[in-house]
Amino acid sequence: PPRRQLRPPPPPPPPPPLLRTPAAPPPPRAAPAGLAEWARLWSGVTDVDDLVPGLREGMDRRSTRYLLWRDGGEVLGCAAVVTCAAGASLEHIVTRADHRGEGIGTALTRYALALALAAGARRVVLTASPDGEGIYRRLGFDTVGHVERYA
């Protein structure tokens, strides 16, 4: 199915993240040891040794922040915020299949958007699958184009 390019609403005040447990908010950025966990959830594969160096490169340049949603040590969601002079992109927002519908994707998106705005982004974009489009619409994003295929 085609993916949709979405445009964000005007910047809201940064909302607090929704928490599954008050003591466990998503960290602002995955620790280097957490990159493998992030890559496993995002990619859906267990052997992520080839992916981690590329992820670490964005982290080292400070252009990318990786977010993990944990509950009791289990990774249930992930997202990334990529910033540049032109703005920011919210990417790879994934909730583990057995925890979809619990608000994790919404909370990660809100948190990622708040980070992008706090970094000075005046324009924030994301690409949504048909399954996630409703979440982003409820958060005020608009469709501005369609992506037929990623390469």
Residue ranges and their predicted role:
Residues 1-33, 128, 150-151:
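Acyl-donor-binding surface of acyltransferase catalytic domains
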Residues 1-3, 106, 118, 130-147:
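Conserved active-site alpha-helix within GNAT-family acetyltransferase domains
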Residues 31-42:
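A short, well-structured alpha-helix characteristic of acyl/acetyltransferase catalytic modules
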Residues 40-50:
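Helix-loop element at the rim of GNAT/NAT acetyltransferase active sites that forms part
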Residues 50-96:
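A conserved beta-strand-loop-helix scaffold within acyl/acetyltransferase catalytic domains
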Residues 116-128:
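Conserved GNAT acetyl-CoA-binding A-motif
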